[in-house]
Swiss-Prot record:
InterPro entries: Cysteate_synthase, TrpB-like_PALP, TrpB-like_PALP_sf. Is inhibited by AP3 (DL-2-amino-3-phosphonopropionate) and, to a lesser extent, by L-aspartate or AP4 (DL-2-amino-4-phosphonobutyrate). Is also inhibited by EDTA in vitro. SUPFAM superfamilies: Tryptophan synthase beta subunit-like PLP-dependent enzymes. Its cofactor is pyridoxal 5'-phosphate. Its EC number is 2.5.1.76. Pathway: Cofactor biosynthesis; coenzyme M biosynthesis. Specifically catalyzes the beta-elimination of phosphate from L-phosphoserine and the beta-addition of sulfite to the dehydroalanine intermediate to produce L-cysteate. Does not display threonine synthase activity like the paralog protein ThrC. This is Cysteate synthase.
Length: 416
C-alpha cells in the first residue's frame, strides 16, 4: 500500500505512486491524494517536516524549508495587525537555510527524490533562472544528472553555494530566446532515451513542495490565513497554495475558509492578469500577449514571464482563483522597486525581484481596501537573503556546456 495516489481532476482516473505528469485520457492536472488526511509533523529540520503531504517515500532530511514569522515593522507601516511573512531564502538568524535563496528549492528536493524512487536517471527542465539554480544545487548534493535549458537572461542567476559538479548540464540560449523557447527545447530533449521531463506545473512533487509555504504558515499561525499574496509567472505557486489549503480544510484543525489568493504579475507582461480582469478562462495571445517577447525583455522580474502558463487547464490557476474568490494585480517596475526598498529597510533582509513584486501588490491591496486591518495575511516572500548568503558562502557560476540559437536546433548538435 502506497502513501498516495495520483488522481485526474477531470475524469477521476487514479494512478499508483509513480513519476507521472499527465492523465492518459485528457489534459487535466493530476493531484496527489494522501493516505494521511491529518498533517503530522515529522522531526526534520526543513521541508521534510511536512512528509505527510509530500509524494515521496523517504523523509527529506534537507535543512531547506520555508519559515513564517509575524511582521512588526512593515505591519505597523501598513496599519495591519496580523501580517505574517512566509520567507523562503537564506536568513540563518530566523532559521531560514535555503542556500539558493528561492522557494524553487522547495520544488527541487521532492522532485529529485521522487525521480530517484521511480528509477529515473536524468531530469530535464527549462528555467528562467531560479528553478535551474535550485535543481542544480540539489543535483550537486545528490549526484543525479540534471539538464537545464535557460534563456540568456537567466544565466546570471545560475550560481551555486558550492562548486558545480559533473552531474549539472547547462544549455544556454542566445539573446532573443525567452523562457517559453527554453521550455520548447527542454521538451524535445526530454523525449531522448533515458531523459525524464521535470514537468513544470504538471509535476505534482513540484507543487507539493511549494505548497509547504502555506502549510508552514497554517502551523505557525494556528489557522489558514485570510489572504495569500504572491507574484506569479506561471501561476504554479498560487495553485500550490490553493491545493495545500484544500488539504488543510479537510484536516479540520486549521479553519474551513480557503485563503483568498491575491496574485500579481509584473508589467508590461501580464497575460493572466488581463484574462482574469475580463473574467476569461482562456488567454487570448493577440489580446493578452501582444508584442510578447519585447514586453518580456522590458519586465523587471524576468522570472515572472511565461507565454504558456497553466491558467486555463482543469486544476490550473483560473480554477484556483475562482475557488478562492481571488484577485489579480499588475505591478510596474517602479512600484516593485519602491516596495523592495520599503520591505528591506523595515524587515531587515534583502529580497529578490519577484518578492518585490509581491510586496508591491500588498501595498496596492491595502490602498484599495482589499484587506481588513485585522485580517490574517500571508505575504509569500518567495526569494531573499542573497546579500546575506554572500557573507557566509563563496558563490560559483555554472558555465554552459553549449549555447544554441533557437529551440528547433538539431538535437545531435547538443552531443548529450
Amino acid at each position: 500500500m502506497g502513501r498516495f495516489i495520483l488522481k485526474c481532476l477531470k475524469c477521476g482516473r487514479e494512478y499508483s505512486q509513480e513519476y507521472r505528469l499527465t492523465c492518459e485520457n485528457d489534459d487535466s492536472f493530476l493531484r496527489a491524494e494522501y493516505l494521511e488526511k491529518k498533517l503530522e509533523l515529522r522531526k526534520q529540520p526543513g521541508i521534510g517536516r511536512f512528509h505527510s503531504w509530500l509524494p515521496v517515500q523517504e523523509e527529506l532530511t534537507t535543512e531547506a524549508g520555508p519559515i513564517t514569522y509575524k511582521s512588526e515593522a512593515l505591519a505597523r507601516e501598513l496599519g495591519l495587525s496580523n501580517l505574517y511573512i512566509g520567507f523562503s531564502g537564506y536568513w540563518p538568524e530566523k532559521g531560514a537555510f535555503i542556500k539558493t535563496c528561492s522557494f524553487k528549492e522547495l520544488e527541487a528536493h521532492p522532485t529529485m527524490q521522487l525521480l530517484k524512487e521511480s528509477g529515473g536517471k536524468a531530469i530535464v527542465l527549462a528555467s528562467a533562472g531560479n528553478t535551474g539554480r535550485a535543481f542544480a544545487h540539489v543535483s550537486a548534493l545528490t549526484g543525479t544528472d540534471v539538464y537545464i535549458v535557460v534563456p540568456d537572461s537567466g544565466i546570471p542567476k545560475l550560481w551555486l553555494p558550492e562548486e558545480p559538479t559533473d552531474s549539472i548540464h547547462l544549455i544556454s540560449m542566445t539573446p532573443g530566446n525567452d523562457y517559453t523557447d527554453a521550455i520548447n527545447l527542454a521538451g524535445r530533449i526530454a523525449k531522448l532515451p533515458g531523459m525524464v521531463p521535470e514537468g513544470g506545473a504538471r509535476n505534482v512533487a513540484r507543487r507539493e513542495g511549494m505548497g509547504t509555504v502555506m502549510l508552514d504558515a497554517a502551523v505557525t499561525i494556528g489557522k489558514m490565513p485570510d489572504h495569500y499574496f504572491q507574484a506569479v509567472g506561471s501561476g504554479t505557486g498560487g495553485i500550490s497554495a490553493w491545493e495545500a489549503s484544500l488539504r488543510l480544510r479537510e484536516d479540520g484543525r486549521f479553519g474551513s475558509k480557503l485563503p483568498k489568493l491575491q496574485l500579481t504579475q509584473n508589467l508590461p507582461f501580464v497575460p493572466m492578469y488581463n484574462a482574469w480582469q475580463e473574467g476569461r478562462r482562456d488567454i487570448i495571445p493577440e489580446i493578452d500577449m501582444k508584442d510578447a517577447k519585447k514586453r518580456i525583455e522590458e519586465t523587471y522580474a524576468t522570472v515572472l514571464t511565461n507565454r504558456a502558463p497553466p491558467y486555463s487547464v482543469t486544476g490550473g490557476l483560473y480554477d484556483a482563483l475562482v475557488d478562492t474568490d481571488g484577485i489579480m494585480y499588475a505591478v510596474s517596475k517602479e512600484e516593485a522597486l519602491d516596495a523592495k526598498a520599503l520591505f528591506e529597510s523595515l524587515e531587515g533582509i534583502d529580497i529578490l525581484p519577484p518578492s518585490a513584486v509581491a510586496a508591491a501588490s500588498l501595498l496596492k491591496a491595502v490602498e484599495a481596501g482589499n484587506v481588513g486591518k485585522d485580517d490574517t495575511i500571508l505575504l509569500n516572500i518567495a526569494g531573499g537573503g542573497f546579500k546575506r548568503l554572500k557573507e557566509d558562502f563563496t558563490l560559483f557560476q555554472i558555465e554552459p556546456e553549449i549555447t544554441v540559437s533557437n529551440p528547433d536546433v538539431p538535437l545531435e548538435e547538443l552531443k548529450l
